[in-house]
Amino acid sequence: MSASITTIPASYFVDIVPGVIGAGQPGLTLIGLMLTTNPIVPVGQVLSFPNLAAVQSYFGASATESVHAAVYFAGYNGCTKIPAALLFAQYPLTAVAAYVRGGALNMTLAQLQAITTGSITVITDTGTLTDATFTQFPSATSFANAAQWLSAALPNHGPGLATGTAIMGFTATGTGSGTALTLASVSGYVSFGPSGDSVTGTGIPSNTTIVSQTSGTPNGAGVYVTNNATTISGTTATGSSFFLDVTAVATGTILAGYEAFVVGGGSFTDEAPLVISQVSGTTGGAGVYLMALANGGRFNQVSEAVSFGPPGVTYVNGGFQISSSTTGAGSFVDFPTGTLAPLINLTQATGAVQSLGAAAAVPATFMAGIVSVDRNWATFETLFDPDGGSGNTQKLLFAAWVNSTSYQFAYLCTDTDITPTESTTATGSLGYILGQSNSSGTVPLWQPVGGGNHLASLAAAFAASVNFNATNGRATFAYKSQAGIVPAVTSATALSNLIANGYGSYVAAATAGGAWQFAYPGQISGPFAWFDSFINQLWLNNQCQIALMTLLTSIGRLPYNLAGYAAIRQTLTGGAQAGAVVLPPASPVAAGLNNGVITPNVPLSAEQAIVVNSLAGLTIAPTLSAQGWYLSIQPATAAVRAARQSPTVILLYMDGGAIQQIDMSSLLVQ
């Protein structure tokens, strides 16, 4: 039997440190961003959706956002991949209010009604709203009605978007004879019919309503028919009503969905009355409005100074939304607290989201804010006309921003201006202006007013559907199509004029025995000239950036010598020698050769040869032409080495273009 011997761990002499050499980063996805004015998207956030069903679930199947998303997620006819995601952000055309929107309730109305009591407190920019013993959910007849009860419990009324004087119900001297009721000295508005006023007074039975008017001033002094016989005799009759008679509107416009509240307080304010519809009068002004109190009852006041504005609490997207009564950058609503808040998903932990108040957006500032939140996208479009259908001021500001981003993003700009279809020099048109200024990165896309062909969404789909991983995956936007898109241009003259002014469009073409519809020609403003060339450089430059970042973060040191420069060269061009590609591609240049972003055997002009030779410091034009690329790494100076800055690294590559028109001669030889 041998004795146990204590030993020294082998790691003392040879220590193996496990590790993984990463496969690298996935790189930029050329997905689209859509700017909407829909307040359902929280201000300051960028929402990402993986597919059309997710967009429809959030916005609604018939929403504008869903209509554009349907075009986007369909890609284009013949594509081998579809967009991986779609982004949305809210662009406030005017100042907007802050809000907190609760997570989806995911409960039945009966389950909500079972919440019998609870406390809730909300801090807003105008003060603290609180109800220590909210008990109204058992009375709720719907989720929207539950929101109305919450609005009554948390009165969050600002100065109001519309103000006026209103009469609710009436008082009069009444005389009854059977079901005939004569009203004299009427103060207020008498309504009749299925939703007629409820009337009370001595000699008037309970639950008596006014059915019709037989004579007298309409809705004023006269003879009415009631559902019950009355014996009132020259005494006061009081009517309560579902209708609000707004006798004058001092400021603003009254809209359906607005909440009415008495200036300085009043009992009907506690019922959060909502405007259902306008019955008569000046649209949005003085007139009669059908209202709905939270308890389903009638108004019983006579005359008040009233303000109207959006309700403080609404039911949106399956959750309760609490909004500030003010708009602009100072508008604020904090996440609610109290025992009720988590039960109805109004806390951050239960899925509530916060939207900040904001002033009317400015394109450059807004887009910079979007990039600070999410920069993993390539194209953007607006689902609205930034200029409201007149002029180009705001569209040019978006174009100016994209021009300032060093070719990182493309603006897909829909324009309905008719003038670029009418002449080759439509000097006031957006495309012409961009062409004259050489502003880069905007894709002007023409469609007629009300055309609705969603060409910008197809352009975004094209960029997001190009399969850069496939051999010859590169594509042009020209000749791309999608079922259901209606052609905007059917005239060769109009098409030629649009092209001359820098626009693309969706066209219909035909010949004997054939007909086609497609996007054409695929231009982009600025030096890249073509939309496909622009997105190709986005992809290639991003791949180079990621490859070099992976190199720098994966090795101990990259020296300023042949070994260091060789590592850079291998990182960028490995597997791409002499124009050939070993699959799978091992480097950005190899991948570019494989997918067609880099094209070999393209001749250079004499002028191009001079420029590229000058950039490289030696004659490279023949090599560049033959293999499609050339990487120049010039040794760093002593000053550069001392500062540990970059050596001069220049990648030149041949785009190769694309044949988009064919003219052929057909000659019979006898």
Regions found by a protein language model. Give the residues of each.
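Structured, hydrophobic secondary-structure cores that serve as assembly/anchoring elements
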Residues: 1-66, 74-81, 520-670
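N-terminal polar alpha-helical/low-complexity "assembly arms" that mediate subunit docking
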Residues: 1-117, 343-367, 375-397, 402-431, ...
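Residues at beta-strand starts and edge strands
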Residues: 28, 114-118, 287, 318, ...
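Extended, beta-strand-rich, solvent-exposed assembly scaffolds of outer structural proteins
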Residues: 51-59, 109-337, 397-400
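Extended, compositionally biased
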Residues: 74-99, 320-332, 600, 605, ...
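A glycine- and small-residue-enriched flexible loop/hinge signal that marks low-structured segments
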Residues: 77, 144, 152, 371-557, ...
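Alpha-helical scaffold segments that mediate packing/assembly in large oligomeric complexes
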Residues: 141, 145, 159-163, 310, ...
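Extended amphipathic secondary-structure runs
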Residues: 311-328, 332-343, 373, 379-385, ...
